[in-house]
Amino acid sequence: MKRLISTLNLSKEDWLRYRKCGITGTDAGAILGLNPYRSAFQVYHDKISDTFENIDNEAMRQGRDLEDYVAQRFTEATGLKVRRANAIYQSEEHPLLLADFDRLIVGQKAGLECKTVSPFSADKWADGKIPAHYMAQVNHYLAVSGFDCWYIAALIFGKELVIHKITTDKEVLNNLIAKEEHFWKYNVMPEIPPVPTGSEGDTQQINQLYSADDRNKTADLNPIRDLLDKRQELSDQIEQLEQEKASIEQQVKLEMQDAAYGTAPGYKVSWVSSESKRVDSQRLKKEQPDIFNRYSKNVSSRRFTIIHASQFLYAYRHTKFALQLFLFNRKAQYCLHNNNCMLR
């Protein structure tokens, strides 16, 4: 590997700009479809856009602030000294692959990735487990560096420090590199987005890309008619399964009667009363319009609906029947008013 640029005096914007020039360790899990918080679709749009994806939150802030502490605890536990990398590195064999290492192990061809973990996610590290997207990240670092092994030190708040050693597996690395290079060659370079995964992140990305609508424009969806048919088929299946699920829940309630709780091998069931207070917005708007307006805000969004032809037919028949019933009632009222009960 080679040292691409020092990060000691690198601005956040320049750091983000360099990361757009290739695939980084945090991109790896998303490209493989292993990251529950980010997808290949999101990585793609980050790479091709002119803007910088400066994502930050409290968990990420704590991770940065506690990186030194985790590294110190790793040294205490293993006796291995570490040093900062202070650079963005690039694979010489595969220049597309970039990396920004947390720490390098002094005197060894090895590195360290520091993690902080919520106690609510402790089960993901239990019994020797490592979250899949972190495994992808570490293997990416092994691919960039050509090192023999990489360590992960995960501080689970209030519980323990978990340390794992991952050794180089050529087959795994070759597979990872092939998928990353395929993503870059067939998606990023020709600017052809990968298929969305259905994740919430992908929905947010699409809504951000197309936040406004043109009411004078209608798209021809014939080329993807098969997708619409597939969606309708899935919707029908979901509706049937939801009804079956509701039927089962009703049977369970009949079995429980007035019992608040129920048990069966492998199951705990509760059916308890609860109370909650909700704001009656219509009444508040009517009786206290000033207060309602003061705490109200306009939210703009695009509503997405798909209506199948069968639903059009149902709506037409329902509307036609309702109209006939309305006319019949009007005629009946007229006859009764005029003492004429002959309805024709």
Predicted regions and their residues:
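Accessory terminal regions of nucleic-acid processing enzymes
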Residues: 1-327, 341-344
